[in-house]
Each structure stands twice: as C-alpha cells, then as structure tokens.
C-alpha cells in the first residue's frame, strides 16, 4: 500500500504567558544555533582546518543543558538536536558549493527576530499533538510551555510524525507532517494536457485555454510601497514602528495567501480534468538570475548597460507568478489523485511548428504570435508551446519502461 507524507498548518491561540514562553524558546534555540555556528567557523578558520561534525556538537548538549538549566535545559533535547541538524545541513551545502566551484556563501548568524521555527522530530518527544483528547478543544503540548490551544480547521489524517512551531509576525502556527495511506485515485477521464507557464497568462493549455495571471504582488504594490515608506519614517524600537511593521507583514501575508489560493484552485482544476499533465521543466532560479556586468573596454572601471533594470522587472513578474509553488502543489495533488505529471525539456517548444515540425526563431515574430515560415501555420504562441510540451511528454511516457 502506497503511503505519502502530508503537511498541516494550524493557527495557535496561546495565552499571554505561553506567547512569552514561545518567544523565549525561539530565542534560546537561536542562541544555540549561533553558538554552534561560531564553533564551526573558528574550527574552519584555524590553521589546522579542524572539522566539527554534528555528532560532536550533539554530544555537548548534555553538558550545555546542565550548565544553563534555566534556558537551554528548559527545552526539549530532541528539538535542540534538530536545530543542530539544521546547521549541519547548511554547512554541508556550503562545502558542496565550495567543491563545485560555485559562490560559497558561508552560513550566517541569525538575529533573534530572524529565527522563527523550532522543529520536534517525533510526536511524543518534547511535544504532543492533540494532548487533551478528552477536551473538545484541540491542544498541542510543548515541553517548557504547556498545552497550547489550536484552531484546527480540518481533520488530520494519518499518523503524526513531526511537529514544528512557526512564528509569522505576531501569529504562531503549529505545522504537522502526517504519514497517510494514498487515497483511492480519481476516476479516469481519458484526457491528457500540456501546459505552458507564462507571465501574460499564468498558464496556457494545449487545448488553447488561457488561465489569467492575477498578479497579486503588482496589485498590492502601491499599498506595500506606502506601508514600507511609513515604516522607514518610524523611530526604531518604538510602538509606532512595531505597528507599521505589523501592517507591512500583514500585506505580504495577504499576497502570499492569495497566491497560494490561486495555485491550489488552478492545480485542482487540472487534476480533476486530466489523467496526464505535461509541463516544462523550468529552471526558475537560472531564469531569474541577475545579468552579468559588462565592463566598458574604453573606460577602465566603467560598465556598459547590461539590461539589468528590464531583467529586474521580469524577475519580479516571475516571482509574482509563483511558478515553483504551483508546480509543487500540482505534483502533490496529482500524486494523491492517482494522476501522472511529467516535466519535459522546454527548449524550442515555442519555436517548433506543430504541423510540419520546422523549428526556427523566425516562427515567433511577436510574444503572442506563432507563424511558421515553412508551412504558414498560425496560432497563439503559448498554445503552440503547450501542444509541443504535451507531445514531448507523451513521447517520454511511452519511452519509460513498464
């Protein structure tokens, strides 16, 4: 029987005392993270190039907790191990970038206001989901904090595996991961579709259907700009500045939620209608990378225009569309529904004629128009791209071993 891991996120309703304790828990885990990072930095910079591993730092936890029982000794041992694993993962990524010749970017120290998550690797070890089952109100218990009320708006299916505390502005959330049996697949429809992601239209299907791009970030840009300007004028560490910061956070939170809502609804519509969905294997990070500077050979120290301003506008539009989030949601929904999703190479999908197969840059005279210079076929460029994506996906599916 197939099993999947699904995440649930619920708003917590802590008391005043619990809110203070949750903040102290984040503060102390942040201190542990920074202390462990300092030890690793010192070892890396030492002439001996000593390597500090996770096991060595985890073995020190018992001594650290005994030395500081009021702070480090107050919290779950397992959650502190998870924080050290988090640092270890960042360090491994750093050394991997060093070996590959990329830009290393050493892990940085975290400010207490920039450390917003504490993980509990196992339900029942330092935490307990639904800790008062006899009570109609759902609660989650954390070591050192107590039973915190939870606004459970949906049922949790399966066995809870991990629990995390997350702070967003002044709100507190509990995030669960649960292992559950794959549900029964949706009835087959016999339909297949290819999708072409875009900016003007959020996506275009191989059938010629266009899904509008809501541009949530652009719609909220004026309000965000005004709120951020008001924030910049406030005196630091004042109540007025805190209120202004809360307003900026609320606007960003609203944009993020609307973007997620649109992604969920669009993905659900595709999964319900089609048995097979092909999409472009987009390298979004590469697409939104800043252009390299162009030195001026005639003026040492000067640079020529490299189109950075126009590229920045395109990058904002790509981020606003949220392609990566949408594709992640689409894959998760398809897995639960028993549908098949396949990523294909996007090269030349919008330049290849679906009628005669001729591929040329001249086939696309404008952003929206496709006109084959060989056979004269005309169509919307995004619809042509989606159709070629579908055909490539079907070919790849047929080539896969049974």
Cite the ranges covered by each PLM segment:
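Positively charged, helix-rich recognition surfaces that bind polyanionic ligands
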Residues: 6-9, 20, 141, 152-161, ...
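Stable alpha-helical structural segments in soluble proteins, enriched in small hydrophobic residues
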Residues: 36, 83-90, 94, 383-393
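Alpha-helical coiled-coil heptad-repeat segments used for dimerization/assembly
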Residues: 24, 31, 42, 89, ...
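Long, hydrophobic, amphipathic alpha-helical segments used as structural scaffolds
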Residues: 37-44, 91, 95-102, 180, ...
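Gly/serine-rich nucleotide phosphate-binding loop at the start of the catalytic core
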Residues: 1-79
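Acidic carboxylate diad motif detector
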Residues: 55-166, 304, 310, 316, ...
């Amino acid at each position: 029987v197939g099993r999947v891991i699904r995440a649930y996120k619920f708003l917590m309703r802590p008391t005043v005392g619990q809110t203070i304790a949750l903040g102290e828990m984040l503060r102390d885990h942040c201190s542990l993270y920074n202390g462990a990072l300092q030890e690793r930095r010192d070892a890396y910079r030492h002439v001996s190039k000593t390597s500090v591993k996770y096991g060595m730092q985890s073995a020190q936890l018992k001594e650290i907790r005994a030395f500081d029982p009021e702070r480090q000794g107050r919290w779950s041992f397992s959650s502190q191990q998870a924080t050290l694993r988090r640092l270890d993962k960042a360090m491994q990524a750093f050394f991997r970038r060093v070996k590959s010749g990329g830009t290393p970017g050493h892990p940085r120290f975290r400010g207490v206001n920039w450390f917003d998550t504490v993980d509990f690797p196992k339900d029942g070890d330092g935490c307990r989901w639904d800790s008062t089952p006899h009570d109609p109100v759902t609660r989650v218990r954390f070591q050192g904090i107590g039973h915190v009320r939870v606004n459970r708006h949906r049922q949790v299916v399966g066995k809870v595996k991990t629990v995390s505390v997350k702070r967003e502005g002044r709100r507190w959330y509990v995030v669960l991961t649960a292992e559950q049996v794959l549900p029964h697949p949706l009835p087959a429809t016999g339909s297949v579709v290819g999708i072409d992601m875009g900016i003007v239209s959020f996506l275009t299907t191989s059938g010629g259907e266009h899904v509008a791009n809501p541009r949530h970030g652009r719609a909220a840009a004026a309000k965000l700009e005004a709120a951020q300007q008001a924030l910049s004028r406030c005196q630091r560490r004042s109540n007025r500045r805190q209120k202004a910061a809360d307003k900026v956070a609320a606007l960003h939170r609203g944009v993020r939620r609307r973007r997620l809502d649109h992604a969920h609804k669009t993905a659900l519509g595709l999964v319900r209608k089609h048995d097979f969905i092909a999409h472009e294997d987009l390298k979004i990070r590469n697409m939104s990378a800043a252009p390299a500077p162009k030195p001026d050979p005639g003026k040492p120290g000067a640079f020529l225009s490299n189109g950075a301003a126009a590229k920045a506008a395109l990058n904002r539009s790509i981020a606003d569309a949220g392609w990566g989030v949408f594709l992640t949601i689409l894959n998760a929904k398809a897995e639960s529904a028993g549908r098949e999703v396949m990523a294909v190479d996007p090269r030349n999908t919008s330049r290849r004629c679906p009628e005669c197969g001729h591929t040329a840059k001249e086939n696309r005279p404008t952003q929206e128009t496709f006109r084959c210079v060989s056979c004269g076929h005309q169509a919307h460029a995004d619809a042509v791209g989606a159709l070629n994506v579908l055909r490539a996906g079907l070919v790849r599916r047929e080539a896969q071993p049974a």
